[in-house]
A protein has these predicted regions:
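Alpha/beta enzyme core
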Residues: 1-139, 143-154, 183-188
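Flexible C-terminal active-site loop/helix
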Residues: 158-188
Length: 188
């Protein structure tokens, strides 16, 4: 944590999953016992508090999947008491569970939204009303990219030109070709 803070990172996420790490919305994951989880968070908080670091500590638990909501809430209460700045229970199953988490565990909460995942996709304003301060959608762009790639490959297989793609001129602008050209012209 001190290394990340020294490098300028704004925050780190410390989680309680057993190794090997798995996606929170997939099967086969488990969490370490509470004592080890507490030690992980405590070590991160102590590292943050050493010197002049202001890095944020996000505590994550995947306990809801294998030990239930009560255990996940208990862990978050403890992580908050230890000094975690942001609280993240992964793969929350319902809106009612979200409300319960916010009600029972004071602090700044994050929610992870994955299309077709375990957590319901609520509107951002609804998540704000429930009490979430951060919402992430970590797979949205990758999922959209895969879908359009599949469509393009299907079209190529069927010998059809793809029309649902960026124009080459737009792509050049996005990746910075025009800047490269300007630099090239400047130093000819």
């Amino acid at each position: 944590v001190r290394g990340y803070a020294d490098a300028g990172a704004a925050g780190v996420m410390i989680e309680d999953q057993k190794w090997p790490k798995k996606c929170g919305h997939t099967k086969g994951k488990d969490v370490v016992d509470l004592d080890e989880a507490k030690s992980r968070i405590k070590a991160a908080v102590d590292a943050r508090n050493y010197g002049d670091n202001d890095i944020l500590i996000m505590a994550r638990t995947d306990a809801i999947a294998t030990r239930g909501l009560d255990d996940a809430i208990n862990r978050m209460k403890i992580f908050s008491e230890i000094g975690a700045d942001i609280l993240f229970i992964e793969a929350v199953k319902s809106k009612d569970d979200m409300k319960r988490i916010i009600k029972e565990v004071p602090g700044h909460h994050m929610i992870n939204l994955i299309e077709d995942g375990d957590t319901p996709l609520l509107e951002i304003n609804e998540l704000e009303q429930i009490g979430y301060k951060i919402a992430v959608m970590p797979l949205t762009l990758m999922s959209a990219s895969v879908k359009i790639m599949q469509e393009c490959l299907k079209n190529m297989k069927n010998r059809v030109y793809n029309t649902n793609v960026s124009k080459f001129s737009e792509l050049r602008d996005i990746v910075g070709f025009n800047e490269y050209y300007e630099i090239e012209d400047k130093y000819k």
